[in-house]
Regions:
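ATP/Mg2+ or Mg2+-diphosphate-binding catalytic cores
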Residues: 300-313
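ATP-binding pocket architecture of kinase catalytic cores
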Residues: 34-166, 170
């Protein structure tokens, strides 16, 4: 399913000057090849020799049109935010920008890290992820992000909000509106939506911020399914990539792990909860994760217009 009309052959026959300016000075390009798979972009690997003869590799993602510019900016700022907190946990982001020679074509550039296809060790992965969540500090003290980020090719709600319940409700509403735009509304959906916003969300999220409790706005990856994580082939340490960040309740991250098709099983949540205390009230933990899953599932249903099973599952 392709949503980007960038011609990879045209883009990789030579390096656009805008990309070249972001590579190390006086480096020599030795190869450019397609690398990786994306529904929304063209991706490639650039191999160079530095001026001292040292080999180095870079990953480039290329998108087109105005939405492509917004997506590359969102990813660059997301990866930069994670890298600032835990530089060992993500490939180093280098730049985002617009091609000089191909109209309306935009890129995201980062260091290339060779990765294995194995799932990361739960304890090692939980250690890295917990550092992102715990060490990060919202610049406003609120939930949200300073720039729109995209899960797939659809925007996420990122406006700054004081309350996590308020932020999540607005985020859920935006995802639902996007889904209804492409798959239509129904009387049943109207009834379910009313119950969701008037009863379910307040029931599960209001207690987090009641009776003296507070929720720390934590930097989250935003789309942390197993295809956006790997193991560095050289260091054997876990890595995450393809982020679409915002500051959220840390447990929101795990809503993406609930579907059976996801390879982040219960052992990863168990490992994480050894390091980070479950938010009170703990008895609502499973219910909160199911609610967060609904937000992810709704967004995914909006992304894949022709798949009606995503709405009914």
């Amino acid at each position: 399913m392709e949503h980007n009309n960038v011609n990879l052959v045209e883009c990789t026959l030579r390096i656009d000057p805008a990309v070249l300016r972001e590579l190390p000075e006086r480096c020599k390009i030795t190869s450019i090849n397609a690398h990786g798979v994306s529904f929304w972009a063209k991706t490639g690997r650039i191999d160079v020799l530095l001026s001292d003869g040292t080999p180095q590799s870079f990953f480039v993602k290329v998108l087109s049109e105005e939405i492509g510019m917004s997506m590359t900016k969102g990813e660059f700022h997301s990866m930069s935010a994670i890298h600032e907190v835990t530089p060992e946990f993500v490939p180093k982001p280098i730049a985002c920008g617009t091609y000089d020679t191909i109209p309306d074509t935009h890129f995201f550039l980062c260091e290339f890290r060779e990765m294995t296809e194995k799932m990361p060790d739960p304890d090692q992965f939980a250690s890295g992820l917990s550092k992102v969540h715990q060490k990060s500090v919202s610049p406003t003290g609120k939930f949200g992000f300073h720039i729109t980020t995209y899960a797939g090719n659809l925007p996420q709600y990122v406006a700054w909000e004081d309350s996590w319940e308020t932020f999540f409700a607005k985020s859920m509403k935006q995802a639902l509106d996007l889904e209804i735009q492409v798959k239509g509304n129904s009387d049943e959906l109207e009834v379910l939506s009313e119950a969701l916003f008037e009863k379910v969300i307040p029931r599960l999220l209001k207690p987090l911020e009641s009776h003296g409790r507070t929720v720390k706005p934590s930097l989250i990856h935003g789309d942390l399914w197993h295809a956006n994580a790997g193991i560095d082939a050289d260091s054997n340490q876990p890595l995450i990539f393809d982020a679409c960040c915002f500051f959220a309740h840390n447990e929101y991250e795990f809503g993406q792990w609930r579907p059976a098709c996801n390879r982040f099983g219960d052992e990863y949540i168990t490992a994480y909860n050894k390091l980070v205390q479950i938010s009170a009230p703990e008895e609502d933990f499973e219910g909160r994760l199911d609610l967060y899953r609904l937000r992810f599932d709704t967004h995914v249903s909006a992304l894949f217009v022709g798949d009606e099973t995503l709405r009914t599952q």
